[in-house]
Regions:
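A short alpha/beta connector and helix-capping loop motif
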Residues: 16-42
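Boundary/entry segment of secreted carbohydrate-active catalytic domains
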Residues: 1-16, 22
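Active-site beta-loop-alpha junctions enriched in small/polar residues
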Residues: 10-12, 37-41, 62-66, 139-141
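Structural preference for beta-strand elements that scaffold enzyme active sites
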Residues: 4-6, 31-35, 56-62, 133-137
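Acidic (Asp/Glu)-rich catalytic clusters
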Residues: 22-28, 44-58, 75, 79-82, ...
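Active-site gating loops and adjacent loop-to-helix segments of metal-dependent hydrolytic enzymes
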Residues: 70-107
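Catalytic domains of cell-wall/extracellular-matrix polysaccharide-remodeling enzymes
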Residues: 111-112, 119-154
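Short, acidic/polar
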Residues: 15-23, 114-124
Length: 154
């Protein structure tokens, strides 16, 4: 059995400049997957860019809980957002048993809020791409509660 290295161009949908670089990396054989953040304004343009320049490229869902705004109504996921309705940065999260060193704060997102936002991001991905994600990964941080949400959404 041969092994295959999967190199993911994470954060696809973050900005036009980044997206152009990710597509270039895919077309030149550096990246094998484009991993889409769906909670950005750029996400629809990123999908269009992929469809025009490399429609064969596999897209993954890059679940984001700690940068920018959520897909869900912020009022429905209070443990994930600040008073402006933006995600708490990963540096504000509690460092849990998984020991992510960037997490140095007091924010502890609940399983229910993580699950609700993940489901919203899966739905948004399906709206943008026209199909459910075949691969899902996390942006920036991973916690045990996030793993539970990933398993629940399955």
């Amino acid at each position: 059995m041969s092994k295959k290295l999967i190199v993911s161009a994470d954060d696809f949908g973050l900005s036009e400049a980044y997206d152009l670089g990710a597509v270039k990396a895919y077309r030149e054989g550096v990246a094998s997957v484009l991993s889409l953040i769906v909670s950005t304004d750029e996400a629809p343009r990123a999908v269009e860019l992929r469809n025009r320049r490399c429609p064969e490229a596999q897209l993954a869902l890059h679940v984001n809980y700690c940068a920018g705004r959520p897909v869900s109504d912020p009022a429905d996921i209070p443990s994930l957002v600040d008073e402006r309705g933006l995600f708490h940065r990963s540096s504000e999260w509690v460092q849990g048993p998984m020991g992510d060193p960037k997490c140095q704060g007091s924010v502890s997102p609940t399983f229910e809020d993580l699950l609700r936002e993940m489901r919203a991001q899966v739905c948004r991905y399906e709206e943008l791409v026209g199909a459910p994600p075949r691969r899902v990964e996390a942006h920036s941080v991973m916690t045990e509660e996030m793993l539970r949400a990933f398993a629940e959404v399955g």
